[in-house]
């Protein structure tokens, strides 16, 4: 299998007033050498569709986080998604509150419900495969994710509806197209012409369809909120948002729909891509499948066959494999993206002016041999071995840093600091459940005689699994 370092694209750098300035395309940044970051203080990168971007090494993140008023993740995110024109609201205050206060604490009591939803989605989504059968897996995974996520976002009234599945899926596609179209326009022209772009108008139409789809459900849920006791209410994100909307000035049903759509846009595709990346890797490593399957089976045996949160947490080898997959196949090129709203003076004396965007190249962290020895080699048991070592030494805190949902300057796939993905525990549980149900039911391998993992596709700031590829699947006798 080709290592990540072998896919690095060269870039031309020059020194300007003591700061390394690199002229690269957006996709080339994904392949920045770790050495290029670890040996310089800052790199200034002119990026397509953006003002100047300053790439900062991870060692500066903790220092910068001490002055939160000088940086804005919200402004940076809104610029990235062209929110002024797409109207995407990725993480509104009411959504953040509902996720952290209600969704994450509900994972334990709803784990079996999620497992049942996933089991049904896998059963309906994948062919019988009594013999080795080619399966275009990404679209099927995307549907499984949409349905199982939807159960906890909008409830059982909508999550399996074809109208809901189609709306959520196509909304994400339309947002991506609209975002790309806006960024291709010169910033000075956008206020005049962006609203007339075909991609923006198509997105508006899609959003109106979503409003129509959600309207009757939201009205019914508001009625339930007025008339039913708390124990009788649906246990999902929509109801929690309705219950708290007065505290966040979200009394308009449209605000609730925008929040729901923004969440599905950011969550569903990243979850589906992570699962697909894991399956593409597993298809090249037949011996590993048995190891992972045994880990899952042992944990389920200790939980009475139920996919409880405790059972999922005890699958250390499975967890390690997924975390290593995420490390070697990051979906985004950069993390900790912030807009400078007040000038920042660094310990070195350098000053970063207002208006600059800061970000840290994720691959530079993931391929740093000082953090991960033999960093460009895929080691599925890397984090399992580290956790076992920490456990034997009685260092429970350090062991936590080596599990899938951990976040630090060494583990940045979920983001960093107070803007670390608030729903990562939900996403991790869902990723494990979908993969586990597939691994327990099917053997998988690549099509033909190839042993090389399918290449991911660079797309702007993203690196995505190829959605057109098939894997061979065969039903196991259980």
From Swiss-Prot:
Statement: the UniProt record of this protein carries the keyword S-adenosyl-L-methionine: no
Protein's UniProt keywords contain Transmembrane: yes
Molecular-function GO term, any one: heme binding
UniProt membrane topology term: Single-pass membrane protein
Signal peptide range in chain numbering: none
Domain of life where this protein originates: Eukaryota
The protein's annotated pathway: Mycotoxin biosynthesis
Residues the record marks as carrying a glycan: 159, 268
Gene Ontology CC: membrane
Subcellular location: Membrane
Pfam families associated with the record: p450 (PF00067)
Parts of the chain that traverse the membrane: 20-42
Any GO BP: secondary metabolic process
UniProtKB keywords: Glycoprotein, Heme, Iron, Membrane, Metal-binding, Monooxygenase, Oxidoreductase, Transmembrane, Transmembrane helix
EC number: 1.-.-.-
InterPro entries for this protein: Cyt_P450, Cyt_P450_CS, Cyt_P450_E_grp-IV, Cyt_P450_sf
Cofactor dependency: heme
Function as written in the Swiss-Prot or TrEMBL entry: Cytochrome P450 monooxygenase; part of the core atranone cluster (CAC) which products are predicted to catalyze most or all steps of mycotoxin atranone synthesis, starting from geranylgeranyl pyrophosphate (GGPP). The initial cyclization of GGPP to dolabellane is probably performed by the terpene cyclase ATR13. The Baeyer-Villiger oxidation near the end of the atranone synthesis, which converts atranones D and E to atranones F and G is predicted to be catalyzed by the monooxygenase ATR8. Of the CAC's other predicted gene products, the reducing PKS ATR6 might synthesize a polyketide chain.
UniProt similarity note: Belongs to the cytochrome P450 family.
Protein name according to UniProt: Cytochrome P450 monooxygenase ATR3
